Amino acid sequence: MAKGDPKKPKGKMSAYAFFVQTCREEHKKKNPEVPVNFAEFSKKCSERWKTMSGKEKSKFDEMAKADKVRYDREMKDYGPAKGGKKKKDPNAPKRPPSGFFLFCSEFRPKIKSTNPGISIGDVAKKLGEMWNNLNDSEKQPYITKAAKLKEKYEKDVADYKSKGKFDGAKGPAKVARKKVEEEDEEEEEEEEEEEEEEDE
């Protein structure tokens, strides 16, 4: 089942994919009533492909090349970057972390070091419990820092939109945000888990 934009061009096929498609069509013609056993069929195709000469494979190579040209042309007309996502502008301001994520970035390494082999889910659960057990005054430093980062982010976005590029201002806030973002990007799965824990 295709996901996402139905207008997105069909993916390009490899020479082997064209070969398998041809084998499937041959099978249907010879045995229209016999359903294809996918595992067995794939194995036979693979074995047959390995024994074919370069000359025999060349027909499928040409088909794959033609399909690549078709795909590249359609993708160019289609617009969005591969995968249906717009390419991220590396200079665009990055979304700032919340107070909870700042807390997580500080305590996640400590939990991992004291609990070797702990799963992502358990780390997130522990972080969620720790955060929920903090009183307001203990949470305040993280919330204040997050608010400052958000304020700077909003200014950066305004700059970015007005100038068409991001003014790469240096400063402790940007450095702190960059550090947190790098860690967050590396552990996106953990963030998703942590968001759930924070909401509970």
From Swiss-Prot:
Keywords: Acetylation, Chromosome, Cytoplasm, Disulfide bond, DNA-binding, Immunity, Innate immunity, Microphthalmia, Nucleus, Oxidation, Phosphoprotein, Repeat, Transcription, Transcription regulation. Residues 9-79, 93-161 bind DNA. The keyword Phosphoprotein applies. GO terms for molecular function: DNA binding, bending; double-stranded DNA binding; four-way junction DNA binding; RNA binding. Residues 182-200 have a biased composition (Acidic residues). It is found in: Nucleus; Chromosome; Cytoplasm. Expressed predominantly in placenta. GO terms for biological process: DNA geometric change; DNA recombination; innate immune response; negative regulation of B cell differentiation; negative regulation of myeloid cell differentiation. The modification Cysteine sulfonic acid (-SO3H) is found at residues 23, 45, 104. Residues 71-97, 161-200 are annotated as: Disordered. Reduction/oxidation of cysteine residues Cys-23, Cys-45 and Cys-104 and a possible intramolecular disulfide bond involving Cys-23 and Cys-45 give rise to different redox forms with specific functional activities in various cellular compartments: 1- fully reduced HMGB3 (HMGB3C23hC45hC104h), 2- disulfide HMGB3 (HMGB3C23-C45C104h) and 3- sulfonyl HMGB3 (HMGB3C23soC45soC104so). One of its GO terms (cellular component) is nucleus. InterPro entries: HMG_box_dom, HMG_box_dom_sf, HMG_boxA_CS, HMGB. The modification N6-acetyllysine is found at residues 3, 30, 43, 112, 139. Disulfide bonds join 23-45. The modification Phosphoserine is found at residue 98. Its main location: nucleus. It is linked to Microphthalmia, syndromic, 13: A form of microphthalmia, a disorder of eye formation, ranging from small size of a single eye to complete bilateral absence of ocular tissues (anophthalmia). In many cases, microphthalmia/anophthalmia occurs in association with syndromes that include non-ocular abnormalities. MCOPS13 patients exhibit colobomatous microphthalmia with microcephaly, short stature, and psychomotor retardation. Multifunctional protein with various roles in different cellular compartments. May act in a redox sensitive manner. Associates with chromatin and binds DNA with a preference for non-canonical DNA structures such as single-stranded DNA. Can bend DNA and enhance DNA flexibility by looping thus providing a mechanism to promote activities on various gene promoters. Proposed to be involved in the innate immune response to nucleic acids by acting as a cytoplasmic promiscuous immunogenic DNA/RNA sensor. Negatively regulates B-cell and myeloid cell differentiation. Belongs to the HMGB family. This is High mobility group protein B3. It comes from Homo sapiens.
